């Protein structure tokens, strides 16, 4: 049975090639075609002999996701992609354009088991984990379609990265490899809802990668309501693991905080958050919620402008470095899960 060559790390591919009589430098050539020239057809890899191309075609194939939909913001060029995988499941990726860099936001699972109440992805349910190749292929597919060079990566798309730990770590190492994309570990961020034991493991396995924790509430009572996994991993456990992560890596931790009108945007919430993060040197991203349909009593509405500023002022007063995230792609379905959810709904 032929295998998708993108699912192999560099080291694994060297081993696979040696089994079929191909030298190590042939891996360099193939990776150069795939990762730098975005060529996914062995027959067009002209610095390989016809015999070698035939050998590769007999044992491997190159599968990158099929583009189903692409939305480009007229405001800031933010680009949202909807991809179809080999098994017809769908995932999303996003390109974010900055004056000095292009950042890719990529998915790690089809759907998400975390089921955060404010997230369109979580409301669609969980299907399966992505392979390392499916994670990495989002990067090269986006580069090919938008003709850009991606320099920063955030694992903040569909899915909980730390619940697909092995494949996520493998994909990071593949993207960092000097023969592949050669993206610095320090330009890669992994966002998690908070899996304490995996946060500590990540510190040991990928100490240079940046960590972002989706906290969203300063206490267990409120977090239980919007982040169901908090019933398993409490705020206190998450903060403790973040401190252990800092101790091991010496990296600053970013905390994501979704602001929801008249739920977690009060002065008292800001005071409790400041107390929780006291002495950590943490960074807080304040994110006004993207409205999503809700079947419960809680309405996911953006806070008033003055409430957002009031929350920020409290953190400033306590010397907690923070910023209000500037929205990108407001004229397209740029929030996580929106494009896929609409596609699934229209198919029914």
UniProtKB/Swiss-Prot annotation:
Q: Which cofactor does it need?
A: [4Fe-4S] cluster
**What is the main EC category here?**
transferase
Which CDD domains does the annotation name? Radical_SAM (cd01335)
Q: Which reaction does it catalyse?
A: adenosine(2503) in 23S rRNA + 2 reduced [2Fe-2S]-[ferredoxin] + 2 S-adenosyl-L-methionine = 2-methyladenosine(2503) in 23S rRNA + 5'-deoxyadenosine + L-methionine + 2 oxidized [2Fe-2S]-[ferredoxin] + S-adenosyl-L-homocysteine; adenosine(37) in tRNA + 2 reduced [2Fe-2S]-[ferredoxin] + 2 S-adenosyl-L-methionine = 2-methyladenosine(37) in tRNA + 5'-deoxyadenosine + L-methionine + 2 oxidized [2Fe-2S]-[ferredoxin] + S-adenosyl-L-homocysteine
Task: Tell me a GO cellular component.
Answer: cytoplasm
Residues bound to S-adenosyl-L-methionine are 159-160, 191, 214-216, 290
Write down how the cofactor binds this protein. Binds 1 [4Fe-4S] cluster. The cluster is coordinated with 3 cysteines and an exchangeable S-adenosyl-L-methionine.
Keywords recorded for this protein, A-Z? 4Fe-4S, Cytoplasm, Disulfide bond, Iron, Iron-sulfur, Metal-binding, Methyltransferase, rRNA processing, S-adenosyl-L-methionine, Transferase, tRNA processing
Query: So where does [4Fe-4S] cluster get bound?
Result: 112, 116, 119
Identify the EC number(s).
2.1.1.192
Name one process (GO BP) from the record: rRNA base methylation
Q: List the disulfide bonds.
A: 105-336
- Active-site residues, record numbering mapped to chain: 92, 336
Q: Where is the Radical SAM core domain?
A: 98-331
State the compartments where it is located.
Cytoplasm
Signal peptide: which range, if any?
none
Alphabetized GO MF terms: 4 iron, 4 sulfur cluster binding; metal ion binding; rRNA (adenine(2503)-C2-)-methyltransferase activity; rRNA binding; tRNA (adenine(37)-C2)-methyltransferase activity; tRNA binding
Primary residence? cytoplasm
The keyword Disulfide bond is annotated on this UniProt entry: yes
Quote the record's miscellaneous comment. Reaction proceeds by a ping-pong mechanism involving intermediate methylation of a conserved cysteine residue.
Protein function: Specifically methylates position 2 of adenine 2503 in 23S rRNA and position 2 of adenine 37 in tRNAs.
Into which family does the record put it?
A: Belongs to the radical SAM superfamily. RlmN family.
What protein is this chain from? Answer: Probable dual-specificity RNA methyltransferase RlmN
